[in-house]
């Protein structure tokens, strides 16, 4: 009986055929597909993390009442300053407008130069009048020309003459009287020359005016002659006395 059971069990054991290798795939191709799948999974995880990291934009903090008042006051001041400048520009003469334009242009050029120097790390630059250190006559003439060119930008300003008076007084205060007298002579000659030029520019009087005045005087003399006999009568009275 036991032998029959053993025979039956042996018959039931059917050998499982071995799995044939897939000849259509290269060695290691399955491994690459598994690696590729793992990369895609990692990419999806990273995308999810990036989405989680994206923060919603923060709302701007609301201004306090004091900040709003300060902003309004600042706008009022800017508007008042703009109107003041416009009013001043309207009252300016063409010469003053040109001088103001040149002044603003000069300030803009200086600002641009300063920004350029800061960009290249240059802390200071010496040039122009400040860079001049004359030691002979020619160099002093160059300095004089540079100063005149600088001051000529303001010659149409209403305060220019007062500025020159103050400047000359300060410059000559430290000089000996002999030097001051010499400069005074130069200024006197310049004054006479300018006076002649100014008189030459005025229109001359017509000759007819002088003739009329002369004729009038002649007529007046004739009137005085009419009273001459009366004065003679007084002379006869003196003889009688």
From Swiss-Prot:
Compositional bias ranges of the Acidic residues kind: 28-45
Subcellular locations according to the entry: Cytoplasm
MF term (GO), any: translation initiation factor activity
Coiled coil spans: 31-119
Keywords of this entry: Coiled coil, Cytoplasm, Initiation factor, Protein biosynthesis
UniProt entry tagged with the keyword Coiled coil: yes
Domain of life of the native organism: Eukaryota
Pfam families, alphabetized: eIF3_subunit
GO terms for cellular component: eukaryotic 43S preinitiation complex; eukaryotic 48S preinitiation complex; eukaryotic translation initiation factor 3 complex
Quaternary structure annotation from Swiss-Prot or TrEMBL: Component of the eukaryotic translation initiation factor 3 (eIF-3) complex.
Similarity annotation: Belongs to the eIF-3 subunit J family.
Protein name: Eukaryotic translation initiation factor 3 subunit J
Species this protein is from: Aedes aegypti
């Amino acid at each position: 009986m036991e032998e029959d059971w053993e025979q039956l069990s042996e018959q039931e054991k059917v050998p499982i055929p071995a799995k044939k290798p897939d000849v259509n795939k290269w060695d290691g191709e399955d491994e690459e597909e598994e690696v590729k799948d793992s990369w895609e999974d990692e990419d999806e995880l990273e995308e999810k993390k990036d989405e989680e990291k994206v923060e919603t934009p923060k709302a701007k903090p609301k201004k306090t009442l004091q900040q709003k008042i300060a902003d309004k006051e600042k706008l009022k001041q800017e508007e008042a300053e703009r109107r003041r400048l416009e009013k001043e520009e309207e009252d300016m003469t063409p010469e003053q407008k040109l001088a103001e334009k040149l002044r603003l242009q000069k300030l803009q050029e200086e600002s641009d130069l300063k920004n350029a120097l800061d960009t290249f790390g240059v802390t200071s630059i010496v040039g122009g009048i400040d860079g001049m250190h004359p030691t002979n006559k020619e160099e002093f003439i160059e300095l004089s020309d540079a100063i005149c060119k600088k001051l000529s930008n303001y010659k149409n300003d209403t305060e220019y003459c007062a500025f020159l008076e103050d400047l000359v007084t300060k410059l000559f205060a430290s000089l000996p009287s002999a030097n001051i007298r010499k400069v005074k002579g130069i200024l006197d000659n310049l004054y006479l020359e300018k006076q002649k030029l100014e008189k030459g520019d005025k229109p001359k009087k017509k000759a007819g005016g002088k003739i009329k005045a002369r004729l009038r005087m002649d007529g007046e003399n004739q009137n005085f002659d009419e009273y001459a006999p009366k004065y003679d009568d007084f002379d006869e009275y003196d003889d009688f006395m």
